[in-house]
């Protein structure tokens, strides 16, 4: 195919832009978004389910960016790690896992200790507190001392939920008769993913440098921070009790989502680590709940699921070029997660990374790097060499997580303006744009009591098809509607149909494009008397 003849299909992911009709706390409705409003009124559109069983999560579990992008790229419902791990604990199979049996035996013989590091949260996005409870039960049954290094959430949960969660954890430890919460650290420090190494360093040092601790309960310490208006996400690394990670110990990082667990893991295990000066702990067994990065020298409890015939793979095997573009905060999502947990690009897949602004929180700069992402995408689209472009706008989600309503409105308005520019560029080359979101967030900024809601939601997400003049979808006659009842798993098959590529049997989602004959039938006059 001549490069000049390519009319691209562009998938635009509005991260965290959910759909909700109630106006209270709804930044999406409060924002001036003439582009999206016009598209919704003019072009084929529908709502998609992006949470719970529709994306491989437990019923009622809110969606998230990792799961959303994985489902979009896989074109099928993929059982998520949250479910896999919970099932292993519930059935007891986790306790017979050969890796854990061997580590328990060695620690028992050599007098080593367990350290459980992870996000102590019921959010279910990066971890789940029930998984920690399962690991603590394992340690107690084996008679091995256990130290919990609790990372506090406040981003996928309410900002001050941590005290309640940690109080419940302390009761669980009392019931088990073993284990102690040794350290606290807000995810702002322990789960940075933007190479702000000074944050990671503070978390690492509290984990590896011992001290007497403050001798107070975790819940009491959390309440003191709340009194200073420091919420869960921003809890400074704090030692509660002696129990630093030492030589001969074993660490289990129980986060199942990789992106925000990598930097801290690298500090523990990489011999050539250069993020900051650190003391490397020798003879340390380091286990991650899932595979964070295939290059990390760690042991993995739950190996990756082998997904075949993903959207990017099908496009690549058809000999077509594709582009993935996002700013730092969502770059892993349009690459690693969209490709089913594969870091390596497919042949013909190019990637553009735009640096996210270096600010403490994104409400300080709601525009983030959306303009730069748009500029680079427009340049790439104008070259007419990419059959598929996958682009993410991070603003609605990342600013929505701050709980700042006015800033989130600005973020949405920024994305709307950028989307208008992007669409004009796609139209210029006769391309087609499919606009979706991966989960809800910005449409719910406070709860029924008026408290800030910084987590995701279970709300459906919009999906809009903007068909290019020079691209007529095969078999659709250029007159297309989008069916209702769809999920994120249906987006991949939809894109393949627009591209004119066959859908592999592994993709069990169904195209959202309604059959042309159904559309025609719908326009027939109703019989008299009905």
UniProtKB/Swiss-Prot annotation:
Catalysed reaction, written as an equation: (2R)-2-phosphoglycerate = (2R)-3-phosphoglycerate
Signal peptide: none
Pathway(s) per entry: Carbohydrate degradation; glycolysis; pyruvate from D-glyceraldehyde 3-phosphate: step 3/5
Organism: Synechococcus sp. (strain JA-3-3Ab) (Cyanobacteria bacterium Yellowstone A-Prime)
CDD domains (alphabetical): iPGM
Protein's name in the database: 2,3-bisphosphoglycerate-independent phosphoglycerate mutase
GO CC terms, sorted: cytosol
Keyword set, alphabetical order: Glycolysis, Isomerase, Manganese, Metal-binding
Purpose of the protein: Catalyzes the interconversion of 2-phosphoglycerate and 3-phosphoglycerate.
Chain residues that bind Mn(2+) 1: 397, 401, 456
Family: Belongs to the BPG-independent phosphoglycerate mutase family.
InterPro entries: Alkaline_phosphatase_core_sf, BPG-indep_PGM_N, Metalloenzyme, PGAM_B_sf, Pgm_bpd_ind
Residues binding substrate: 126, 155-156, 187, 193, 257-260, 330
GO BP terms, alphabetized: glucose catabolic process; glycolytic process
Residue sites binding Mn(2+) 2 per the record: 15, 65, 438-439
The protein's required cofactors: Mn(2+)
Quaternary structure and interacting proteins, as annotated: Monomer.
Gene: gpmI
EC number assigned by the record: 5.4.2.12
